[in-house]
Amino acid sequence: MLKAVILIGGPQKGTRFRPLSFEVPKPLFPVAGVPMVQHHIEACSKVPNLKEILLIGFYQPNEALSSFLLKAQQEFKVAIRYLQEYSALGTGGGIYHFRDQILSGGPQAFFVMNADVCSAFPLVPMLDFHKQHGGSQSYVILGTTANRSQSLNYGCIVANGETQEVLHYVEKPGTFVSDIINCGIYLFSPSIFQHIAEVFQRNQQELQLEENSSWQRTEVIRLEQDVFTTLAGRGKLYVYKTEGCWSQIKSAGSAIYASRLYLSQYGSTHPERLASTKEGGPTIRGNVYIHPTANVDPSAVLGPNVSIGMGVTVGAGVRIRESIVLHGAVLQDHSCVLNTIVGWDSTVGRWARVEGTPSDPNPNDPYSKIDSETLFREGKLTPSITILGCNVSIPAEVVILNSIVLPHKELSRSFKNQIIL
């Protein structure tokens, strides 16, 4: 029997995803038409003999999360539960805190994955690789190749070229270590908890030496810095390298890139989710997802990489490209939306143009990843995709360029390179 654990974080995390995470927990943000974490759940449901999926995070249980889990459970026919941490315990602390729940039923192995990654999720090949490399006493990290300069932003893995054993692991090194990076998806045997327990006991001993220390801190354990670094070179940790698509979803801008990756996968996994040009319907270019309840005028042109949410209205002559339009939004006649996320129930007026700058990886470098740009550089706002928070109103005939508009704003003029509070 197998299980899967998805680490979904909490409201204090994912702040780079604001203003979109104000309205909905980040793991439930729709990417390519379905909540971000549903892609993980679907991949897990396809693994033979995987009986339970546990979501671990420190969001207060809320209606959106509960109804999503109920629907997912019915759709994918697998048990799904949410376990709430009492505070942020780190990637290792969360699974250690709930180790009894994870080990109940006696799974031979379990997957652990971060909710904010977009991937082809090669879980079955990882499982086969795990069986060939020590099974119950070994652990597998999913790795991919990055270019030299960007590898410094990730966990770097030095591996034996023949056996794929991890010899050395460094989280976000100061200088170049390796171009194989950690994808945030792991396969563990239950014996991993012995190694996490060693870290827990070490933390306890260190805190006993400190005055006025908090007992909570002993439970804060980071898999990457605390566990992998000590396991490397001991013949227990292996890396399974994937050539498939992979990206982090840290900033709101990376959601559009992740949407593109998932939409391109739909061609083989879910062709029914992709729209096509039909007589009497809008013109579709490339991969486009349109929710069945959306109302799109036949003269509109959509794509490539467009995702239209529930109940959206798209008027005559509208052009949308490289964008996500969330539920209830209205794009009035002849408006133009490029490289933008249009928030829930927002309105874009007639002949208005809303445009951002894509934050895509370098297309000429096959190993390039998306850069997590800082919001400001040299005192200026970094050009990025445009984001309209929920319930924003854009008047007719204005241009909004490279701007972030916080929720419930009614704009009256054009803006460029601004955060509108």
Swiss-Prot record:
One MF term from GO for this chain? transferase activity
Q: Where in the cell is it found?
A: Cytoplasm
* GO BP annotation list: biosynthetic process
Q: Which UniProt keywords apply?
A: Cytoplasm
Query: Which residues of this UniProt protein bind GDP-alpha-D-mannose?
Result: E85, Q248
Q: Name one GO cellular component term.
A: cytoplasm
What CDD domains does UniProt report for this protein, alphabetically? M1P_guanylylT_A_like_N
- Give the main localization category: cytoplasm
Q: Hey, which family's this protein in?
A: Belongs to the transferase hexapeptide repeat family.
Complexes and interactors: Component of the GMPPA-GMPPB mannose-1-phosphate guanylyltransferase complex composed of 4 gmppa subunits and 8 gmppb subunits; the complex is organized into three layers, a central layer made up of 2 gmppa dimers sandwiched between two layers each made up of 2 gmppb dimers.
PANTHER family named among the record's database cross-references: SUGAR-1-PHOSPHATE GUANYL TRANSFERASE
What is the protein's known function? Regulatory subunit of the GMPPA-GMPPB mannose-1-phosphate guanylyltransferase complex; reduces the catalytic activity of GMPPB when part of the complex. Mediates allosteric feedback inhibition of GMPPB catalytic activity upon binding GDP-alpha-D-mannose. Together with GMPPB regulates GDP-alpha-D-mannose levels.
- Description of its domains: The N-terminal substrate-binding domain adopts a Rossman-like fold and has a binding pocket for GTP or GDP-alpha-D-mannose. The C-terminal domain consists of a series of tandem hexapeptide repeats that adopt a beta-helix conformation. The beta-helix forms several protein interaction surfaces involved in assembly of the GMPPA-GMPPB mannose-1-phosphate guanylyltransferase complex. A loop extending from the C-terminal domain (C-loop) is involved in interaction with other subunits of the GMPPA-GMPPB complex and may be involved in allosteric inhibition of gmppb catalytic activity by gmppa.
Q: What is this protein called?
A: Mannose-1-phosphate guanylyltransferase regulatory subunit alpha
Q: What is the lineage of its organism?
A: Eukaryota, Metazoa, Chordata, Craniata, Vertebrata
UniProt gene name: gmppa
